[in-house]
Amino acid sequence: MTKQDTTDKLWGGRFTEATDAFVERFTASVDFDRRMYHHDIRGSIAHATMLAKVGVLTEEERDQIINGLREIEAEIEAGAFEWSVKLEDVHMNIEARLTQKIGITGKKLHTGRSRNDQVATDIRLYLRDEVDVIAAELLRLIAALADLAEREADAIMPGFTHLQTAQPVTFGHHMLAWAEMLKRDFSRLADCRERFNVSPLGAAALAGTTYSIDRQYTSELLGFNGPAENSLDAVSDRDFAIEFCSFASLLMMHLSRFSEELVLWTSAQFNFINLPDRFCTGSSIMPQKKNPDVPELIRGKSGRVSGHLISLLMLMKSQPLAYNKDNQEDKEPLFDAIDTVKGCLKAYGDMMPAVSVNRDAMAESARRGFSTATDLADYLVRKGLPFRDAHEVVGKAVALGVSSGRDLSEMSLEELREFSADIEVDVFEVLTLEGSVNARNHIGGTAPEQVRAAVVRTREWLKRNTEM
């Protein structure tokens, strides 16, 4: 491992005694913030390039710094870099190593910069890269749901309210409901990215710097939309972390609801779908078990992400301007939320294309639950009955079905006419599952024709949003 001198703090000139050993460990963040090494180095290269442009560094000094930073990045990626708790964080570790490698020139890098604007820049760069990965995974899952919806556009299942059979719907329509939620999540993520893509670099500690820096130039080098307008806000703002975790919490809430349905549907009591074996596990004692661990775990992980949102809100509550050490606590919840969301989206993006559907079980479940009762009421309304009277008539017919163990479609015309003389032989056209779903043939409806049209619109949306 590459050694570096850690006997003196880079900020130690004002102090007369060494940091307490426990406090040194307690206040260090290098164990978790070193994942931002690439972004820290990228920000430093941009800063050094700008310092040379404005005449603070010579071109030779700039090149020394940039080459040294790239060598350090290679050391880190090769596992040859020794991280030190004594140096507190990713920034000081890299700067100390740079000075060790290139000498006094390395000490010039931090000119016109503070760790306050440095870390704010690093986090935004890191989050931006991760958001782009998450966006791609989100689009992949939406595409998988659209493919599944197209494949099962005419597969009939019971729709539920209160988890009780309500009306027949198509499986494709149900999948597109989840796709709509994820499309809203994507929109929130894109909005979040646009808002946080501003550069804090150059804000320094809190008030800006006395050097004639070019913040617009570093902003462009780093791919930001522009420099942050206010130096105080630039170094103290963590809205972007909160906003990301808000997006993540909503997304995970949606995935949790989706997971609950997958868990139910794989059970013997529903038997609507089958998950591939490679996404399930068995029991250590019960040989017959095939457990839907992936959706169960994703359902459980939603809570930790919501917890991270609350943690960040409470972290920032009551903080005065500008930077406070409290803000070191922003990274672990943010990083874990990022990791959790990426993992969950990848798992479902891989799994959903391989889900198989048990059409017979779904249709039978829809038939058992009197799911066409509303269709019979609508039929009577079209015959001239007020809806409330039709509702009463059908309720009595359902009661007979419950007591006799039959669906409405299994009753004879004579039996049905005992409840209303307006019922005629054409009633059986509306009492079939197919007739029920096909009748809802409008935008947003469950008819197979509408499902296929919605799939086309979803794919057009995907095409428009392949790049944020």
Swiss-Prot record:
Pathway: Amino-acid biosynthesis; L-arginine biosynthesis; L-arginine from L-ornithine and carbamoyl phosphate: step 3/3. PROSITE patterns: FUMARATE_LYASES (PS00163). Pfam families: ASL_C2, Lyase_1. Keywords: Amino-acid biosynthesis, Arginine biosynthesis, Cytoplasm, Lyase. One of its GO terms (biological process) is L-arginine biosynthetic process. It is an enzyme of class 4 (lyase). It catalyses: 2-(N(omega)-L-arginino)succinate = fumarate + L-arginine. One of its GO terms (cellular component) is cytosol. Gene3D superfamilies: Fumarase/aspartase (C-terminal domain) (1.10.40.30), Fumarase/aspartase (Central domain) (1.20.200.10), Fumarase/aspartase (N-terminal domain) (1.10.275.10). Its EC number is 4.3.2.1. It is found in: Cytoplasm. Disulfide bonds: none annotated. The keyword Transit peptide does not apply. One of its GO terms (molecular function) is argininosuccinate lyase activity. Belongs to the lyase 1 family. Argininosuccinate lyase subfamily. NCBIfam families: argH. HAMAP family: Arg_succ_lyase (MF_00006). This is Argininosuccinate lyase. It comes from Hahella chejuensis (strain KCTC 2396). The gene is argH.
